[in-house]
Amino acid sequence: MHFINEFINRGYFYQSTDLTRLTQISNSSQIVAYIGFDCTAQSLHVGNLMQIMILRLLQQCGHKSIVVIGGATTKIGDPSEKDKLRRIITNDEIQQNISGIKRSLKKFIKFDETKNDVLLLNNQEWLDSINYINFLRDYGRAFSVNKMLTMNSVKSRLERHTPLSFLEFNYMLLQAYDFYYLNKYYNCNLQIGGSDQWGNITMGVDLVKKLSNNEVFGLTTPLITNSSGEKMGKTADGAVWLNEDMCSPYNYFQYWRNIEDNDVIRFAKLYGEFSEVELSKLTELFFNNVNEAKKQIAYKITLLCHGRDEANKALNTAIQMFEHKKADENLPTFTIKDCNNLKVGIPITELLVTIGLAKTKSEGKRLIQGNGIRINNIKVNNINLVVQLHDFIDQVITVSLGKKCHILVKIAK
């Protein structure tokens, strides 16, 4: 399996520096590629999933890859695709986020230092110790401010007259230096990132060529949206996280189960690692029974993230909920310990906050008014509804937010 050919066939390709030469090198020798993740949250999400699948593909094709966690660059903040200055994230938050991101990555990837396992690095290791004066003297001459001002991440902010701090302006220098450092000490010759990173990546390519004259490449992926134009991993309820403490395996399964018909085959190629034979069968199934095809995709993608046991539980729970119309014990569960409250009753908005489906009672009201809440699969229309003991069947009710998020609410025995 040739890396670039498979990369293009799956739909990962957007733009590249010297694609012909990169293809030749990747077909004839082992490349060393790096992908970076900044530490802005305690988990990666579905929007990061393509980059993770690319890391797996590199490994499967016999290439070496490096994951760089941006412990240092997160302190600065990437201005790409941003309309305003990022909130400064504290060092403690960054360390917590690094821990969570490592958990996300280890679900999919084996980290080691053997021939084609993935190496995990943190750019704090080399950026935190940089002397600013020395950095300007040694590397500042290699960067053109004229070119930096033409970068989309900078240009768009200036055109909209939105603030761009000198702090953020430095981000692209540090990312370029990351590539130079990785090339010098790890023989890294390829950086892969999203299409919004093209300017930062090409600056890194130029820096390496100017300072060492080594042959390096940049490769970017497209921004993936669904058929409605929404970014992958974004829902009305927030991001779809990869870590199970932030998004249960069942809700993760449901996200994929509820994709639009037009996205089924495309997402199978992007995220499912289906073989050609499997994809052919899936395509045939899609035209005969689209819902069954969606279940197969949801199962496969959940299996890759959460393992076979959790994927089986999620599939069985979905079948019980939507085909047999029964609540399933494998749903995320909240237990009410004091049933005396239920004798008087709990306002629905208070219950939504208590079980974590709404952050505030006001948000709970908005969800109800938007027809987003169901109890035991019956739509809640009354924002003043009081949930009482008689609403529970065998001491259980199912509270649902939209089609994808379900909580089993139990009364403690």
From Swiss-Prot:
GO terms for biological process: tyrosyl-tRNA aminoacylation. It catalyses: tRNA(Tyr) + L-tyrosine + ATP = L-tyrosyl-tRNA(Tyr) + AMP + diphosphate + H(+). It is found in: Cytoplasm. Its main location: cytoplasm. GO terms for cellular component: cytosol. A motif ('HIGH' region) lies at residues 39-48. GO terms for molecular function: ATP binding; RNA binding; tyrosine-tRNA ligase activity. Residues 346-411 form the S4 RNA-binding domain. Coiled coil: none annotated. PROSITE patterns: S4. ATP binds at K234. Its EC number is 6.1.1.1. Keywords: Aminoacyl-tRNA synthetase, ATP-binding, Cytoplasm, Ligase, Nucleotide-binding, Protein biosynthesis, RNA-binding. L-tyrosine binds at Y34, Y171, Q175. A motif ('KMSKS' region) lies at residues 231-235. It comes from the Bacteria. Homodimer. PANTHER family: TYROSINE--TRNA LIGASE, MITOCHONDRIAL, TYROSYL-TRNA SYNTHETASE. Catalyzes the attachment of tyrosine to tRNA(Tyr) in a two-step reaction: tyrosine is first activated by ATP to form Tyr-AMP and then transferred to the acceptor end of tRNA(Tyr). Belongs to the class-I aminoacyl-tRNA synthetase family. TyrS type 1 subfamily. This is Tyrosine--tRNA ligase. It comes from Orientia tsutsugamushi (strain Ikeda). The lineage of its organism: Bacteria, Pseudomonadati, Pseudomonadota, Alphaproteobacteria, Rickettsiales.
